[in-house]
Amino acid sequence: LKKRKVNILNHPGEHAGSNDANARRKYGVRGNFRDSDGELIALKNYMDAQYFGEIGIGTPPQKFTVIFDTGSSNLWVPSSKCYFSVACLFHSKYRSTDSTTYKKNGKSAAIQYGTGSISGFFSQDSVKLGDLLVKEQDFIEATKEPGITFLAAKFDGILGLGFQEISVGDAVPVWYTMLNQGLVQEPVFSFWLNRNADEQEGGELVFGGVDPNHFKGEHTYVPVTQKGYWQFEMGDVLIGDKTTGFCASGCAAIADSGTSLLAGTTTIVTQINQAIGAAGVMSQQCKSLVDQYGKSMIEMLLSEEQPEKICSQMKLCSFDGSHDTSMIIESVVDKSKGKSSGLPMRCVPCARWVVWMQNQIRQNETEENIINYVDKLCERLPSPMGESAVDCSSLSSMPNIAFTVGGKTFNLSPEQYVLKVGEGATAQCISGFTAMDVAPPHGPLWILGDVFMGQYHTVFDYGNLRVGFAEAA
């Protein structure tokens, strides 16, 4: 791991809230960044699905490969006391008896991730990242890694770069300790993820700066709206140049380096699946209900001033479909700004149809075309958190998918949002979009994982509590 000088961008002057001001006072940071040294951590790229780097824990350092995860806040590695989990047999394990700087804690801990979990206990020791030595850092020794999630993983553990608000056990995150000990001059870190898995350089994480070699133009910054995750407000999602009609009034989004794909609401992912020909899960119940109630819903949409009440009036709230977020349904009559539907969770599949139908009505489609369109969308309903396959030979005919962030449109081409596994006749193509529905008040929510961050160099600006995106280079 080499260290080289990286520049700090001069950020435009912005009004800083109390949290920003407190951060600057605490770390002695001025409003604008200045040139300084940043610590560069080289990352390895495994099939565009996992990006990991090396750290050392203890004295002398015991080496571990970790995912640097902006979607969580704890550091954990397998423990030498992990006796009964098969996953521990295939990964490096921390031995406290081999470290002269180890301090016992012993407090139990457990973390649940989207696709797996770990449990163990807290310990304290030094953590080495490149040339930076973080002293007296609390971390978790994992003694249980159930299931197969971590068994085949190319990494040993996870180093969280989220906020302390979501830290299990309220442990101080490594990034916070790094700042408190004055190891970096500026409270900012940045990611470049190389999407060419064949190249030797898989990517890089820079603590305390940004690398100008890996982005073009200026970063577009958006404020963090909820500390915990690196969460911000995102605007409309476009398929081609057409709105999906769901996030036009705003959706929450999280920049998450620990998630491989783009995860979003079933409502939009279904529309994307239909547009790119992804093979989703057929829902016969969805199709039969649309055939039965579709025409009546269209008639009510054309006349009803409060479309959010249509589903309950039609007694469709008993339909128990896949989990979804609260819907934002916009009136077709006055095209007023979207309001929260207020529908209970079981009503959401019906509300999803309302959104789809409204989009078609706006495009002056006929009743027959609207019914056929929604019927086809039923066939494309994805499995929650499931992957969808696409035809590798059809990429040239697929549309761009775009996200609106900070008033700017960030495009993804089919070559960028489709993951190709293998070569030649045996190649398989996986859609980079997966369904993940979050209940209010936290939803509707998108997770912009490596598929997005690989195309857009990402700056996590803790001092000003904002996230920045620029075209990667």
UniProtKB/Swiss-Prot annotation:
Matching InterPro entries: Aspartic_peptidase_A1, Aspartic_peptidase_AS, PEPTIDASE_A1, Peptidase_aspartic_dom_sf, Phytepsin, SapB_1, SapB_2, Saposin-like
Domain of life the protein comes from: Eukaryota
Gene Ontology MF terms in the entry: aspartic-type endopeptidase activity
Active site: D69, D256
Propeptide: 1-33
Class in the EC hierarchy, top level: hydrolase
Keywords: Aspartyl protease, Disulfide bond, Glycoprotein, Hydrolase, Protease, Zymogen
Glycosylation sites: N364
One GO BP: proteolysis
Documented EC number(s): 3.4.23.-
Keyword Flavoprotein: no
Domain annotation Saposin B-type: ranges: 281-384
Domain Peptidase A1: 51-470
A Pfam family recorded for this sequence: SapB_1
Tissue specificity annotation: Mostly present in the violet parts of styles and corollas of mature flowers.
Family named by the database record: Belongs to the peptidase A1 family.
Name of the protein in question: Cyprosin
Gene source species: Cynara cardunculus
